[in-house]
Amino acid sequence: MSSVKLDGVLKAVKQVRGGVHVNHNKNTADCEVVRIPVPEKVLLPMQQHIGVPCTPTVKAGDKVSVGQIVGDSDKFLSAPIHASISGTVSAVKQATLANGVITQAVEIESDGEMRLFDGLEPPKVTGKESFLRAVRDSGLVGLGGAGFPTHVKLRIPPDKNVDTLIVNAAECEPYITVDYRECLENSWDILSSIYTLKEILGFKRVVIAAEDNKPEAFKVLKAIADRDVAED
């Protein structure tokens, strides 16, 4: 296993001129992540990221499985959308999102089985291009408001030299604590992903960016990273 020693943490500026300073309200910081029950029905909008909306690849009456692509686009700035439950497509229709955007959506009624798609298998990564393709096929997008497709972020232009990977664990919005819980509960998954990115994309330096109200999260990540370097 390739390893990397974390170089540091980017802390939020303690005093910012202007703006509105609201309470953090991180009341869920000590609550473990829980798995929600399987819903009876899901509505999957085809616009879940910045860029070109997906086109539905299924129709009403189709049987679908977990992980099956139900929407895709051949445009670069886009990412496929997968079924989150198994069941039957009950409708392909227009839907209005919380932000007022009107888009096509795939409605699936659950069969309660959460059956995995037969075509699901670990990606065969042999280099940079196959890795970026795997990221794209996974449908990964950012958790920010834009939902920026991850494969686009990771594709460095050939005329650019990027030597530092900054992993964003900052949560500037009040109430949100998902990044913090991920750092505590899935620290090795985060670090192993960092190792993979460093090795395949050739980063020389890695920094995890976090506010100074997350000392425990960074302490856990740094301890595991330092231990792995020592064992290597």
Labelled PLM ranges:
Residues 65, 71, 90-91:
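Hydrophobic beta-strand signal
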Residues 74:
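Cationic-aromatic interfacial patches
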